[in-house]
Amino acid sequence: MKKISMPNPIAELDGDEMTRIIWAMIKDELIKPFVELNTEYYDLSIQNRENTKDQVTVEAAEAIKRLKVGVKCATITPNLQRQQEYHLTKLWRSPNATIRAALDGTVFRAPILISKVKPVVSCWKRPITIARHAYGDIYRAVEYRVECPGKAELLFTDENGRELSRQTIFDFKGPGILQAMHNRDDSILSFARCCFSYALDVKQDVWFSTKDTISKDYDQTFKLLFQKVFDEEYSEAFEQAGLRYRYALIDDVAAKVIRSEGGIIWACKNYDGDVMSDLIAAASGSLPMMTSVLVSPDGCFEYEAAHGTVVDHYRRHLKGEKVSTNPLATIAAWAGALKKRGELDGNTALIGFAEKLGRAGIEVFEEGYLSEDLAALCDPAEFREMPDNERLMGLIREKLTEMMQG
């Protein structure tokens, strides 16, 4: 079988631990036999981020901006325990936070549904997509550990050094903590446009939530700018498409989502989207059953698996144990990136392969071959086998080969 040509590269961002192993298996067994894979490779393992003082992450983000498409493996965001484990000189920043700040985009996450695993929320019939603002808030916050009594103030000066606002945050009588975060109008406006444009593409309603009753400037700004963009740029198109936009407090939307049938885009601020995307994934089946794409305002796309490095499987793997790791989200990331590359280049063969790659793993799972995370959630009558990683990848390759020859 002649391999599919891929003249233009994508940025490939390798990662850590078990997902790094799965990453290599997907490339070697599912992609390279069929495609002349063309990537610019960036090693974002925690060891290489340490060796390069995290410069490799900055370079990877720039590559995505230049090439327009990137695909990222799961990476470690170190805490104190990980710092000691990997002998790090500092707690390096989350690679995702660095990349999202550089691209200033919106993260869209949606569950991968299979009939063998029923959602925990029985009324959900269609996937719920989380649209997460990928800039600012606590991910770009400045923090301070207060050790003694004193006064904390919020001070703003203009570019000429003129004081425009000074507010007392709190008079500390003893130890405590401080955090200051920000966002930008232009980033919020881009977030709104990304959400509404995506909704028109996939024909789904948009629900947006904040807590503007409490945060009367910060969250209120999000609410007002979203409404402005909708009214001035999208209301007519939504009406013609039979779609709706609604705003509500986040606690209200959370309650309504649980009672909905799904099939909506839930637009969230950065932290809210971080939390709710995992909740939607777990309630739909499993965290490794979640697609994730970062879309920037200037048309850049970064695809990744919306889960961690599966450290428990990695440690068992290092002991020589056979493990059964769910590869579907990582396969979906590769499939999404290759399809987008094909769409941008007019490469119909690459688009067709990417679509088959995305379906192959799902069809294997639908036949009852399930990874460890899903096996316990499946009706025993429909469960066939829990294959280890090598066997599961072999089954997916067989299915993909059938599709390519069909």
Residue ranges and their predicted role:
Residues K2-N8, M18, I22-W23, D28-K53, ...:
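N-terminal alpha-helical transmembrane segments of multi-pass membrane transport
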Residues M6-M25, L154-A248:
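Glycine-rich phosphate/diphosphate-binding loop of Rossmann-like nucleotide-binding domains
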Residues D14-D16, K68, I130, C195, ...:
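Buried hydrophobic positions in well-ordered alpha/beta secondary-structure cores of metabolic enzymes
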Residues E36-Y41, D201-T210, Y234-R246, G342-A354, ...:
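Flexible, glycine/charged-enriched surface loops at secondary-structure junctions
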Residues I46-A60, K223-I264:
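N-terminal small/polar loop signature for handling phosphorylated ligands or for N-terminal nucleophile
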Residues Q47-L164, Y271-V275:
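N-terminal glycine-rich phosphate/adenylate-binding segment common to multiple enzyme folds
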Residues V257-K356, E363-E367:
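Glycine-rich phosphate/nucleotide-binding loop
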Residues K319-T325, E343-G406:
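Internal helix-turn-beta structural module
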